[in-house]
């Protein structure tokens, strides 16, 4: 599938007519995704890509606004197909402020990687489209905590050592790109996708000064804090430590940026299949520690642990503070049941997103059993220590005869996953 994100933002239009034209395109895009894609069995299913992002703004966020009908259609689409995801123009304008003091609303790259604000020194105008990221290296916060043995002095010492290891790793990525000639990929470097360089010119100048970013990723904040404090980072006693960890990583990025004139930024790593790899490595190194290493996954970025009882609004409100500390990219999700008969509740969540958090999405279920035609939730059950997918209507366990769509880290998956992500 094409790795593409479609950004639906009415305020990008340069005039009212263009906005009306854009609204028609957005409407048709949402209707097409709501319908789905027909598979080889003739069943309309949820496609994984392209990813859709819908911007909530003053012209569409409340009933009675000119483009409210698009927002209601987006809510119906989310309830059925898990997209679009939502960016709050209001919050993004507050958080993404350039050196001229102007806030900006723009899309991410892929599922969550955001460029930092940048003003072109030649034009003194902001630029987002056509920039890029040089790469990511992720620090395993759980490993840092477990290696410290709950000794806080040791924790910060090990933390700094691991951060320096990430620093050197990111510089390796950067050095690999240096000297690359524009001829290596003309469509990127010569014809305008990322730049318009002459033939034979190195891309080096695009690697400095904020034109591109390079990301320090992090994973497992929940388990890190839980091990060190004995409490979840949602606990008021543990939250300050969690925020201190986040700020420490941001301070490291700030120092590296000043040192190299390269735009390092902190990034809430999606983790994808690496969540399983990290979990297994932790178990091999430290054994089974209840509540910390006893799962086949570690928690994505700053997220509240999946087992924690918390309502959608409280989760988004809590995570918004941590999202602000992930300027290189982050996203928050809430898990909801089938909402197709309760669109007003979806809209209420969307309006909460607009007022409280920059970037969020709703995860629901979108499944189909080819054996019996069941289109509710395909269940996960444990069978002899292994997780298997089962149709609750007919008992079908053949993955080739069911369509399952889930979003577990960043993208909607339709091809099943390793045991950690399952």
Residue ranges and their predicted role:
Residues 393-422:
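Long insertion/accessory domains within large nucleic-acid-processing enzymes
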Residues 141, 146, 218, 230, ...:
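Generic structural "secondary-structure junction" signal
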Residues 214-227, 247, 407:
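Contiguous, well-ordered alpha-helical segments that form the cores/surfaces of helical PPI scaffolds
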Residues 1-210, 231, 235-393, 397, ...:
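Conserved catalytic cores of very large enzyme subunits
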């Amino acid at each position: 599938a094409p790795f593409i994100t479609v950004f639906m933002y009415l305020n990008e239009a340069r005039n009212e007519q263009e906005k009306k034209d854009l609204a028609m395109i957005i409407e048709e895009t949402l209707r097409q995704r709501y319908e789905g894609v027909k598979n080889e069995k003739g069943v309309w299913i949820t496609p994984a890509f392209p990813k859709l992002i819908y911007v909530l703004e003053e012209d569409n966020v409340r009933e009675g606004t000119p483009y409210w009908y698009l927002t209601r259609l987006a809510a119906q689409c989310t309830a059925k197909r898990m997209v679009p995801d939502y960016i709050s123009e209001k919050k993004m304008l507050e958080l993404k402020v350039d050196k001229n003091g102007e806030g900006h609303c723009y899309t991410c790259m892929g599922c969550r990687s955001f460029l930092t604000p940048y003003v072109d020194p030649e034009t003194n105008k902001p630029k987002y489209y056509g920039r890029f990221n040089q790469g990511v290296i992720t620090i395993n916060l759980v490993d840092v905590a477990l290696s410290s043995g709950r000794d806080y002095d040791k924790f910060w010492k090990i933390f700094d050592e691991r951060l320096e290891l990430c620093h050197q790793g990111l510089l390796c990525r950067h050095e690999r790109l240096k000297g690359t000639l524009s001829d290596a990929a003309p469509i990127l470097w010569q014809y305008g996708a990322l730049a318009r360089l002459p033939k034979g010119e190195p891309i080096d100048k695009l690697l400095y000064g904020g034109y591109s970013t390079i990301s320090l990723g992090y994973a497992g904040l929940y388990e890190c804090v839980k091990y060190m404090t004995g409490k979840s980072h949602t606990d008021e006693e543990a939250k300050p430590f969690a925020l201190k960890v986040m700020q420490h990583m941001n301070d490291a990025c700030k120092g590296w940026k000043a040192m190299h004139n390269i735009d390092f930024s902190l990034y809430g790593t999606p983790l994808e299949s690496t969540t399983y790899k990290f979990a297994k490595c932790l178990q091999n190194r430290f054994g089974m520690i209840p509540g910390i290493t006893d799962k086949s996954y570690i928690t994505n970025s700053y997220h509240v642990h999946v087992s924690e009882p918390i309502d959608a609004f409280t989760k988004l409100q809590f995570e918004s503070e941590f999202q602000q500390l992930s300027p290189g990219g982050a996203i928050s999700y809430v898990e909801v049941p089938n909402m197709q008969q309760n669109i007003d509740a979806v809209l209420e969540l969307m309006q909460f997103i607009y007022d409280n958090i920059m970037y969020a999405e709703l995860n629901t279920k979108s499944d189909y059993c080819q054996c019996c035609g069941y289109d509710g939730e395909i269940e996960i059950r444990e069978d002899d220590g292994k997780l298997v997918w089962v149709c609750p209507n007919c008992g079908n366990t053949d993955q080739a005869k069911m369509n399952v769509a889930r979003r577990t880290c960043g993208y909607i998956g339709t091809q099943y996953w390793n045991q950690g992500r399952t």
